[in-house]
From Swiss-Prot:
FMN binds at K66, Q88, Q123, S124, W168, R178. Keywords: Flavoprotein, FMN, Oxidoreductase, Pyridoxine biosynthesis. One of its GO terms (biological process) is pyridoxine biosynthetic process. This is Pyridoxine/pyridoxamine 5'-phosphate oxidase. Its EC number is 1.4.3.5. Substrate binds at K49, Y106, R110, S114, R174, L175, H176.
Length: 196
């Protein structure tokens, strides 16, 4: 039985550390589900980079499919799935852009080729051929030769402020444990169990 208390972030931290300790590959990889202006859903895998200021932070291109979806409808759903230890964590909340200073600080830690790629790629747009992207990478490598690569204005982070977090624990006979935290109007958390 999962020991539920008042702080879902403590539970998340404990379970993430457990997944890493058990060598779950890319334990910080999560699905991010968004919905566009027509109500069409889309999902992709991204990396959780930090948990801070009461939210879950990931990065990407603001002009990408996910960026446009979030601009239109900032309510998103995140999901971590660790089948080797029979656990999932589902997070529903509102995605907000983080500060430019936070995005700058993280961008500075990225590998140089990843920094160049953020300039070269028109993420989610149609491209004529793979060599087109290679040429753009070469162009930006030349442009920033011998310089620190600055963060592009169209690239940065989002922080998902959760309204609900579900911790799912797989059990035999599909009688799984589902422990729910829901945000209350006073900023606290209501906890309850949900039927599997």
């Amino acid at each position: 039985m999962f020991d539920i208390n008042k702080d879902p972030f403590e539970h998340f931290d404990r379970l993430m550390k457990e997944a890493v300790a058990k060598q779950i590959p890319e334990a910080n990889a999560m699905s991010v589900a968004t919905v566009d202006e027509k109500g069409v859903p889309s999902v992709r895998i991204v990396y959780l980079k930090e948990v801070s200021q009461g939210g879950f932070v990931f990065y990407g291109n603001y002009n990408s499919h996910k960026g446009k979806d979030i601009e239109t409808n900032p309510i998103v759903c995140l999901n971590f799935h660790w089948p080797a230890i029979w656990q999932q964590i589902r997070i529903t909340g509102k995605a907000e852009k983080i500060s430019a200073a936070e995005s700058d600080a993280y961008f500075a830690t990225r590998a140089r080729l990843s920094q160049i790629g953020a300039w070269a790629s028109h993420q989610s747009e149609t491209i004529p051929a793979l060599d087109w992207l290679s040429r753009r990478v070469q162009e930006y490598e030349k442009q920033f030769d011998g310089q620190v690569v600055p963060r592009p204005p169209h690239w940065g982070g989002w922080r998902v402020i959760p309204t609900e977090i579900e911790f799912w624990f797989g059990l035999g006979g599909r009688l799984h444990e589902r422990h729910i935290y829901q945000r209350t109007e006073d900023g606290g958390w209501k906890t309850f169990l949900r039927s599997p």
